[in-house]
Every structure is written in C-alpha cells, then in structure tokens.
C-alpha cells in the first residue's frame, strides 16, 4: 500500500510529507500540522511534540483514533492536551498553498486552528492498496476499482494457484495480520487445510500513553446487537502504575452476556502494546470472564 494523497495538497513540495518522510527528517519543524488523527498521525504527534515541535492535529471525525472506543482514547487525548498538542475535531483542510515562509493552510469545520502557516504538513489520512499497480490483471487476477484483490479464507485469489496477502487484500492494514495471512497461504499452497479464521486482530498505537485493543469494541457490539458486559480496572488502583507516576490508564474486558466468553478488550497506558497479547489469547482461547475474575 501507499499513503493516500489529497488533491488540494501540494505533495510535490518537500515540506509536505507522509509517514515515511516523517521518519526521515533532518531537522525538527517548529510548527507541524498533522492531517489525520488516526494511529499514525497521533504517533507522529507524540514523537514531534517530545522533540519540541508545536504540533496541530486536524481530524474530520468527531473523535481521535476512529475505530477505537472513545473511553480508550480519552486518557491519550487528555495527555496530548496537557503536553500542548492542539487537536481540532470535525475539522478539515480546504486548501493548502506553498509559500516562501511555509505551507499556507485554510480550514473549515467546528474547531479552527489559530495558525495558518506551517513549516511542515504531515498527511496521515490513510493508505491505499497497490493492487492496480502490480500488473495482477495480466495473470487474470481480479482487482477492484479501489485497488484491492479479493481472496478466500485460504488467501487464494480468483486464480486458484495465485495467493495474495497483506494490505492489498483489505483492512486492517497491519503487518502482523499480513504475517498470519502469509502462514495460511504457504500452508494452503502446500496442500494443508489452513484457513484465515481469527476472532481478533490487535491494533496498537505507540503513543504516550499507548492505546491497544483487540476483538470487538463496545461500538461494534452495539452495532451488531450483541448483548455484552464489561469489566474495567483503573490503573489508579495499581501500585505499580502509581509508583511509575502513570496511573491515567485502565484495562477493559468485554464479554458476551450469554456465554461469558471474552469477545474483546482494550488497554490504555504504558506498555499497553505488550499487555494486549494477553487479551488476544483470552479471546482466541474462548476464556471465561468468571474464570479470569477468579485468577490471582
């Protein structure tokens, strides 16, 4: 896949960067505008604010990190605000022009940034698959108008001996999902009965604090009409978190009310990206919420 480019942004100007360019800067911009309040945008906001940049984040949706439950995102949003990151929700960029002193930007929405000139503009509004750019159709492989390649549960395309994995086969565009798909494809190609059939794919934002979730979110449960319960442990009740001076986080488990099986969970706090693996295992193994509650 490749970063999505916006037609009204001067992408030919070196001061306009994507996530790859943001990791390759030779200087620290004084004023950085980030278009997109998703995982990548917020990770870069965390990094560059720590390096001393004045950071502004603009997000079209009504919350940061769309797709995550709002309660998981709130501790991160509060800390970003405390650190001086300027966040503007339900707001979009309507125009950007390259000037001598910086990139001049015009906004529209509910929360307009005060600044209109920036030293760097990071475009982090998503990624697009490269299915239409690899000549797959020459081999008879079907490619959608958006550049995705359809596959079955064995990662086979419409041409049975050709497999596809990773960003090109659909969301979520995550490396660890692609690795699992590769295992399935390799085993299927070897003649084994392997299938991509998982109950969860973890997502992690390496921000400060980290945000991680797996399985179904509360919003997804509501949309699918699933009756669920949840258990939340505030890190303010954790001696270790208090000793570390980072007790703003919490751990949440979501379970099916009828079966008590764990179907989702989320963690916000330091090292959440490491801790989420336990939630992933609980979901895949069909762990019982009552059993977990009785575990010391």
Regions found by a protein language model. Name each.
Residues 1-54, 58, 83, 87, ...:
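Glycine-rich dinucleotide-binding loop and its adjacent helix/turn
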Residues 51-153, 216, 223, 227, ...:
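A Rossmann-like FAD-binding core segment of flavoenzymes
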Residues 68-79, 165-223:
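A conserved FAD-binding loop/helix module that cradles the flavin
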Residues 2-4, 88, 142-143, 192-202, ...:
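A short alpha-helix-loop-beta-strand transition element characteristic
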Residues 12-29, 116-189, 196:
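FAD-site-proximal beta/loop scaffold in flavoenzymes
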